[in-house]
Amino acid sequence: MIRPRRIKVLVVDDSAIVRKILTDAISAEEDLEVVGTAPDPFIARDKILALKPDV
């Protein structure tokens, strides 16, 4: 059986605790994959260009 493609997610929040909670929750989902995290929009922009997340 072919597995569906996982949705790649970049988690962006200024709080390290919130990033950790979101990363753990998203990672628990079979169809989602956290490809990175960022603490601000400037770092997020660089990571979006490099990692090409879906969300």
Residue ranges with predicted function:
Residues 9-10, 55:
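Hydrophobic "anchor" residues on beta-strands that sit immediately upstream
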Residues 13:
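Conserved acidic carboxylate
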Residues 37-55:
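Acidic, metal-coordinating helix/loop segments flanking the phosphotransfer/catalytic sites
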Residues 8, 16-36:
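Two-component/phosphorelay signaling modules centered on CheY-like receiver
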Residues 1-8:
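Non-catalytic signal-transmission and effector/linker regions of two-component phosphorelay proteins
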